[in-house]
């Protein structure tokens, strides 16, 4: 059994750095920037910049802008069944900062943090930064296998993406959620719930947040505006159980003081005026159409190479390669052609990795997706070496 943690972190981090300024096809986590309501957003930002009062030009508090915290709490109660008050909401610089705060508050050196396997390497990096030991827990069709988690008796916390698992895309079953909550209660452990891509389900109504099922106060809930609106906004949020709140506020204050108040105040009005809810509704249809375009293109051009894992939600889908295809080699050559998938093998920890690709579709039109899949097909043929490259269709 190979230990994948250092290699996977390095490979994933390198890929993210290389793609930092790219808008190329297959970019995971990139929303439909072409559909963002720029006029409404720009109008609000301009108005707040012109009328910015002195108190919003000074240092802000580590909890975040109170009107935004109230708007976030109201949205989460209505849309995600989260049990929270504005006092429990902390505004942070995206989900990665939220994970850093969870590690700083909840983990000590050598504590065990469990993660989904495969899962999100960015979470491993944040949780390992305090000296925590990362251990993978396998998945099945219902999500995290809690029976396997039971064997991690020293686990201090578990990080999960129950609404839309990254990278495989399944939702954690309700019965499995109850098992996980009982495990946390019984072991005095914490659950970090990253509500990744929860806004976009295509085949069914989403389950409410795991946090809303928690009667023991063991769940820390993470969300972000970066993927719903645009990544450069760098605003996200935590919902923290009351007994932990003071420690999280202190950690936030030590890490970065506060997030820009201009954007916080503009976002508050963006939500209050209904732009946010309308944008989410429009994007469900947009992403379903783009998902359909990618699935169709894969079936036409790559059905003999790729098996689609799950395509029921979100802004990406994952695929398994047929045996013998090196996903890292494919990703390197794809980057040279301006395509930016993620090698699925880099998402595995503490086990033999399986080869595949994570393909983002949120930021690309149907025409761009069709061209990108044709180019990817030729790249894979070149890597395999068994067939000549095919001309674009």
Predicted regions and their residues:
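Short beta-strand segments
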Residues: 27-28, 138, 159-161, 192-195, ...
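Short, solvent-exposed loop/turn elements at beta->coil junctions and helix N-caps
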Residues: 225, 305, 344-349
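Conserved core of the PLP fold type I
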Residues: 45, 50-188, 198-216, 220, ...
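N-terminal basic, amphipathic alpha-helical segments
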Residues: 1-47, 249, 253-260, 268-271, ...
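Conserved core segment of the aminotransferase class I/II
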Residues: 41, 215, 220-285
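Hydrophobic residues in well-ordered beta-strands that form the structural core
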Residues: 115, 136, 193, 267, ...
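Short glycine-rich anion-binding loops that position phosphate/pyrophosphate groups of nucleotides
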Residues: 31, 162-166, 227, 364
């Amino acid at each position: 059994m190979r230990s994948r943690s250092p290699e996977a972190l390095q490979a994933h981090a390198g890929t993210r750095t290389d793609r930092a300024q790219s808008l190329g096809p297959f970019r995971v986590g990139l929303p439909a920037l072409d559909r963002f309501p720029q006029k409404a957003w720009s109008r609000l930002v301009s108005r707040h910049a012109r009328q910015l009062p002195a108190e919003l030009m000074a240092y802000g508090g580590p909890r975040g802008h109170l009107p935004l915290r109230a708007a976030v709490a109201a949205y989460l109660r209505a849309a995600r069944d989260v049990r929270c008050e504005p006092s429990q909401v902390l505004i942070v610089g995206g989900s990665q900062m939220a994970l850093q705060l969870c590690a700083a508050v909840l983990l000590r050196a050598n504590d065990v943090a469990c993660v989904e396997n495969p899962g999100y390497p960015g979470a491993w990096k944040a949780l390992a930064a305090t000296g925590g030991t990362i251990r993978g827990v396998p998945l099945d069709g219902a999500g995290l296998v809690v029976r396997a988690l039971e064997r991690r008796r020293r686990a201090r916390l578990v990080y999960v993406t129950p609404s839309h698992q990254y990278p495989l895309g399944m939702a954690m079953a309700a019965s499995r959620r109850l098992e996980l909550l009982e495990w946390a209660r019984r072991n005095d452990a914490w659950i970090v719930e990253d509500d990744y891509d929860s806004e976009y389900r295509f085949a069914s109504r989403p389950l409410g947040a795991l946090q809303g099922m928690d009667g023991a106060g063991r769940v820390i809930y993470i969300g972000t505006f970066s993927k719903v609106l645009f990544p450069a906004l760098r605003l996200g949020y935590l919902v923290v159980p009351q007994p932990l709140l003071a420690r999280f506020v202190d950690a936030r204050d030590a890490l970065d003081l506060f997030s820009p108040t201009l954007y916080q105040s503009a976002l508050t009005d963006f939500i209050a005026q209904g732009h946010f809810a309308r944008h989410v509704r429009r994007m469900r249809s947009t992403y379903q159409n783009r998902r359909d375009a990618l699935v169709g293109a894969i079936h036409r051009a790559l059905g003999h190479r790729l098996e689609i894992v799950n395509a029921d939600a979100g802004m990406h889908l994952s695929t398994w390669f047929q045996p013998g295809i090196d996903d890292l080699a494919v990703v390197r050559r794809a980057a040279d052609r301006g395509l930016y998938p993620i090698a699925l093998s880099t998402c595995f920890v503490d086990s033999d990795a399986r080869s595949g690709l994570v393909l983002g579709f949120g930021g690309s039109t149907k025409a761009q997706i069709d061209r990108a899949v044709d180019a990817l097909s030729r790249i894979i043929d070149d890597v395999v070496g068994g067939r000549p490259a095919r001309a674009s269709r």
